[in-house]
Amino acid sequence: MDKEITVRVGTPEDVDGMMTLALAACKENGLTNPNPVKLLHEIWAGLTRHHGIVGIIGEPNTEFEAAILLRAEPMWYSDDLTLVERAVFVHPDFRSAKGGRARLLCEFAKQASEMLDIPLVIGILSSERVSGKVRLYERQFGPQSGAYWIYGKKTGDWVKDTTPEDVLTEQ
């Protein structure tokens, strides 16, 4: 029998697995060269629940299948908190697997928003496989509220001009 796929709340012990997944997400879909220190700062805040939370699909001390990073912060023009999605990422090895991992991460985000009683701001900033992501988000969240445009680059392009060593040594 297949094991049920669930999203668990991340803990500080998940930091290495989250960093690995985050760097993979940045390599595939980041707009610019990632700063591992900034990634760690955001991830650590979510793992320690300091104005954030992380949802993870995968067991501790293994390679994670998928994750979502959410941060509670005000919009730039307000003091009221919103729950802002920093990243949703399903590892490529699990995208076509049964279980609807992206859907489960969306449900995790909605539950967090409802429990905190603050609005969720979530979106798609990608140059690849956009239409399928839009359909998923419309099913999960209803009609969209805006859109993004990127001028001058595509997500993931920074990798073409960077070596793996650059990512880890430039910071």
Which ranges hold each PLM region?
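A short beta-loop-alpha structural element at the N-terminal edge
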Residues: E4-T20
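Conserved GNAT-fold acetyl-CoA-binding loop/helix
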Residues: L23-I43
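A short helix-loop-beta-strand connector motif used in the catalytic cores of GNAT acetyltransferases and
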Residues: I43-I56
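A short, internal acetyl-CoA/4′-phosphopantetheine-binding micro-motif in the GNAT/acyltransferase core
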Residues: R86-G99
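Conserved acetyl-CoA-binding loop-helix of GNAT-fold acetyltransferases
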Residues: S96-Q111
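Conserved beta-strand-loop-alpha-helix junction that forms the acyl-donor binding cleft
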Residues: L120-K133
